Amino acid sequence: MILENACDYKGYLASVFDELGFYGSFEVVGDNIELNIIPKDNSETPTKEQVLEKLKEIMLKAKKQELEAQINAICKEKIVKDFRSSVLGNLHAYDLTLEDQANLQALVIANIDSVFRCAEVNNDGVVGNKTYKNHTKAQILKLSQEALKFKQSLIIFYGREKERLSAITSLEALEKFVIKEYLI
């Protein structure tokens, strides 16, 4: 069986062999894939159309998973690196790793003044060096509320991007999919 202009699918052939229930081998010749199919358990040999459809289905699923992982990584990076607040009077950048979030929540619960790591952001948007700066308990509470709102906004935005991705049902539509940028 020859699959014309199908060389882009070669990485997904092993999965097709498994899912359609056959053994065999393949060779890429130019843009074509030449398949040698051996059915398992006396089953019927799949048609070229069945093989191509299954290839597209598997490739679509794999590419959607890759894009979803990219969306998750973008969201996580923005949560960790892009949070800004003016609770200290002027704009400061704060990290929001899980540890930072836990520490912030612990300070809110303790209801105490404390130092918290942040960096001043100048008028050009350049972030200085992070240092531990004094925060009142009111500033810590406000910072926590702003951080939660920021994180929630990102999660909702990128969750909607994953919903857009999930609705895609063809490779053609997937090729046109571009992850939108969250603008603060």
Per-range role (PLM):
Residues 1-184:
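A preference for well-ordered globular domain cores
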